[in-house]
Amino acid sequence: MEKQVRVRYAPSPTGHLHIGNARTALFNYLFARHQDGKFIIRIEDTDVKRNVAGGEESQLKYLKWLGMDWDEGVDVGGEFGPYRQTERLDIYKKLYEDLLERGLAYKCYMTEEELEAEREGQIARGETPRYAGNHRDLTEAQVKEFEAEGRIPSIRFRVPADRDYTFKDIVKDEVAFHSNDFGDFVIVKKDGIPTYNFAVAVDDHLMEITHVLRGDDHISNTPKQMMIYEAFGWDIPQFGHMTLIVNESRKKLSKRDESIIQFIEQYKELGYLPEAIFNFIALLGWSPVGEEEIFSQEEFIKMFDAARLSKSPALFDSQKLKWMNNQYMKKQDLDTVVELSLPHLVKAGRIGETLSEQEQAWIRDVIALYHEQMSFGAEIVELSEMFFKDHVDYEEEGQEVLKGEQVPEVLRAFAGQVEALEAMEPAAIKAAIKAVQKETGHKGKNLFMPIRVATTGQTHGPELPNAIALLGKEKVLNRLQKVIG
């Protein structure tokens, strides 16, 4: 009988949930759910100096926001816990002591200064820097001497000589490494904390992980983990290394690149929809059959096939994400769009935190004008700017429109119509524009464009009668007067 699929997402709490980490989690989630397997969250927090406050909470909170759930983990428990590495130190100790006893690992007393000098010498000689094995076979007398000096050892894994390590990668097909390319690597640091490669191999085995799907940057760790599996006589899981995510310059996405929004929390704050972010990330390095790009989470689960993970780097296209979020925004009811928009209008000082019923109705109608156009909640601030300014600036194209010979006549006639209106309603505005057409004989662009530009400052925008109605009589007349002079 085939083993049940068990995969894990194992972040370090060294920062908030990044788009790259979210993709790793999402592909593991889809892989597990597609095969009725188990999805596990494990926190790899042994690099205590790099852990940040709130890092773990951010990971879990925003995975949930994206719509993912998990079967085992730090917050839900499970039979293979604990799921936080700093709570598993006794487990690691027992196992690395076993390696020491069997001579498969040894204590290394070299200082950082000695190791650095060794590295510099290798580089100067044109060699690849790696540990040369100086303390591989220390005598008892040497060990006693180092300990008398107060040196604290690390523990290194004894890498087998002249061995090929080959594995069939789910994404890359066959990958091969040679053991002679590796020095004996540290499995326990001087502070007694296991290194990444040792802890990961132990955890993946003890948690019965069947498939390890992770980023391309981990591929050089794989042979080291295979050596540890082999040393204990454990079955090796299947590995899959997903290609890097690159920016539009085809360079690896860097967390330091502030020109691209890269953290899930930021997208939530900007008023993006979790379903759209999920959809976008699911297509970063994976492609479905056909041309369709908009899918629900359930559809992704049903069709996810790891064989369709791309071998080429995944392009992070910010404009495509905006387009995709807009597709989802269009499907939302107005209440949801209002909820996503209001905090940004408050933050920009456009509206107060507390609104009267009349103000609530007005701002709701303003947001409704842009429902189909909005890419994300925060965009409402820029889109609706004309409703919150006394005067408008005219675009270059708009300035050309206002130079037309018919403009003063059209605007004077329209101002007269607006002045006479009892209520600024879209239907009444529409009727007023028709009356101007009848009065002046101007129609089409010669009629509509001067009115649009003079009242809104724009040559394109929402339905004109609706926009003018929401601007209110005073603003509209002031703007018309400014152009008429």
Curated annotation (Swiss-Prot):
GO MF term set: ATP binding; glutamate-tRNA ligase activity; tRNA binding; zinc ion binding
Residues that coordinate or bind ATP: 255
Any single GO BP term: glutamyl-tRNA aminoacylation
Swiss-Prot/TrEMBL catalytic activity: tRNA(Glu) + L-glutamate + ATP = L-glutamyl-tRNA(Glu) + AMP + diphosphate
Chain positions of motif 'KMSKS' region: 252-256
Role, per record: Catalyzes the attachment of glutamate to tRNA(Glu) in a two-step reaction: glutamate is first activated by ATP to form Glu-AMP and then transferred to the acceptor end of tRNA(Glu).
Family note: Belongs to the class-I aminoacyl-tRNA synthetase family. Glutamate--tRNA ligase type 1 subfamily.
Protein name: Glutamate--tRNA ligase
Organism: Bacillus anthracis
